[in-house]
């Protein structure tokens, strides 16, 4: 399987810094998609999908070999890699490189994002993944449709 984005030069700890509230266990990076989602292998060999847009971490395969086999099937590739959406973005000039991803001015976790024209842009991968980790940490306990108040800046000091 040919990877869409090289992961060789990525700093996993930097990518996961704002996600350790959701993913505290030691993991290695297997792959990523064009939206900054990360596919991680646990010490036990299971494969996890960190969906940075949705703010979820889910087990998707019992092993790396099962994960790679699943990626040979178009429906699974579309679910995890969103290749058709990436191709559509590329036709509109959105072509992230290996340290970039497609981000959204209003994150897709907010219903309002669907109404924003030209919401997508090419973002720095580290900044986007970090921002979304902090965002999802702040709204993790908010019910769907609930009101949120976001804090931009350093997190409050822990006591």
Model-derived segments and spans:
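Compact, glycine/acidic-enriched structural inserts
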Residues: 50-87
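Mixed-charge (acidic/basic) macromolecular-recognition segments
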Residues: 77-129
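A surface-exposed partner-binding patch
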Residues: 1-49, 106-159
